[in-house]
Amino acid sequence: MAEERRRDDGGDVEVELSLRLRTGDDSTSADPAPATVAAEARRNLTIFYNGRMCAVNVTELQARTIISMASQGNFGKQQQQQIQGRDDHHYHQGESSSGGGVSTAAARHCDVAGSSSSHSGSGSGSATPPRPALVSPRAGLQAAAAAAPTMNQPPAASGLSMKRSLQRFLEKRKTRAAAPLYARR
């Protein structure tokens, strides 16, 4: 995905998003196995949003839809289709029906859709699992970005881990130096 920034006459910055896909080797070899084709149909998409990074596994159609919505800026107006009749395995694998909601893959990947489920108010204690509520694509992307590990940690947390790492390194170095293999003569 490429991002270009242009200035309008009014000084506003427009962001143009585009998706450039390469198919790889264009040689006329034998047809690939169906499993290979299915695996290549889904690719990782890295989303940088609100200072965070989230990598999700999406199809080309879903990636194009995300880019289209990002360039139009109408995240709040569109809603994804409600997911019904899927078992938990498919729910976490990122499977979606033909052209299903874009944010469903991101939400399932980051385990956020389960937290936005709605319970039926029957009160009878039925054993049916709660169904996920409708989530807008923007909410799905925000939740995916929130659940993703951040690359830029706060200075205090990264400073402590760096200090601990350095202490472990120095202790191991001292142990290696004292070992008979490295004994000084």
Curated annotation (Swiss-Prot):
> In what ranges is there compositional bias, type Low complexity?
137-157
> Which residues does the annotated region (Disordered) include?
77-185
Residue ranges of the Tify domain?
38-72
The superkingdom listed in its UniProt entry is: Eukaryota
Q: What GO cellular-component annotations does this UniProt entry give?
A: nucleus
Annotated PROSITE patterns: TIFY
What is the designated name of this protein? Answer: Protein TIFY 5
Q: From which organism does this entry originate?
A: Oryza sativa subsp. japonica
